[in-house]
Amino acid sequence: MQNQKWIDEMGSAEGAAAAIAPAVRALFAKGGAGRVAFTAQEAVAAGDASALRIGETAGIEEVYAALNQAAQDGARPRAVHVAGVGAFAVSAQADKAGTRLAGRIALVTGGAQGFGEGIARELAAAGATVVVADLNLALAEQVAAALDAAHGAGTAAAMKVDVGDETSVEALVRGIVLRFGGLDLLVSNAGVLRAGGLEEMTLKDFEFVTRINYTAFFLMTKYAARPMKIQARFDPDRTGDIVQINSKSGLEGSNKNFAYAGGKFGGIGLVQSFAKELVEHRIKVNAICPGNYYEGPLWSDPVKGLFVQYLKAGKVPGAKTVQDVYDFYVAKVPMRRGCSPADVAKAIAYCVEQTYETGQAIPVTGGQNMLK
């Protein structure tokens, strides 16, 4: 039965659960690799001496105090029962061998294709639990199933999200917290592009690109930071990471591509500002600025890919075919190839592994864009 005090304080018993689960994970699933699964069913198995039961309380801080005291007393419960909210099953897994990514809970938006799919694949290979979030749920489910098949059941989960819609973003993060107990890494990757000059660009397209590439990063950070803050409060050894997949167009303006470049420039401003705000919670915020991923659908889609869009928009002087556009862009890269998901994943791994950089925009462009 839901307790009215939780509804008054947290909006709902489920909202309270989303605030409690990260604390339970931080205190009792030590080492960073553990999970906590929530169920609204309040009953805890009879005779389970390891279960921690918290009765009627005045609010969330009293629950936090009870959890903290139990941890200080050496309790290691397999389940935590909070009256009026539900039960939290604790799975305190040992850290997997490898990098700091091993055993962490990672969220990749736009994870069903392109860079996002490749990033999800690399994170899973590094031992992370990966939430593949995308507007296209069916495609996200295919990616998650492939990751489970490659790395074992429970490696990945698919969830639907519209990153430009606040209600959808809040529901996504809450769903992750209730299923896994928290969140360690956000890779804000979802993005769109509409090429065109001043006369071709419509206000509708400009606002759409801005909503997905700029506003959505604010929304994702706002809600993803919440469980990270709670985890950091109760586990002094835990850090969180937020990584925006930006672009080389966030470092240098792009001809007849101002909607995209403007949002990416703004994204770096958000990265720097969020980094200053969240550092006290041990949350690092950085951006990766990849070069062009020519093999991905953003560029190669035969109907709406950038090669086609740029050809139609006349971005490449004298270009008559898609191959002409391709050759033009590859010639700009000193390493003579496009950026791959593996290149980006290595940069993400660096962001997570290192402990002294935040607010940075890291070029991964094959030498095309160099810091000045």
Model-derived regions, located:
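Glycine-rich flexible loops
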Residues: 1-106, 118
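Substrate-binding pocket helix/loop in short-chain dehydrogenase/reductase
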Residues: 197-198, 205-207, 329
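Active-site loop immediately N-terminal to the catalytic Tyr-X3-Lys motif
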Residues: 199, 252-258, 280, 336
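Active-site helix of classical SDR
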Residues: 221, 263, 271
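Alpha-helical segment proximal to the catalytic Tyr-Lys
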Residues: 226, 276-277
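Residue(s) in the substrate-gating loop at a strand-loop-helix junction
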Residues: 247
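C-terminal substrate-recognition "lid" of short-chain dehydrogenase/reductases
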Residues: 337-364, 369
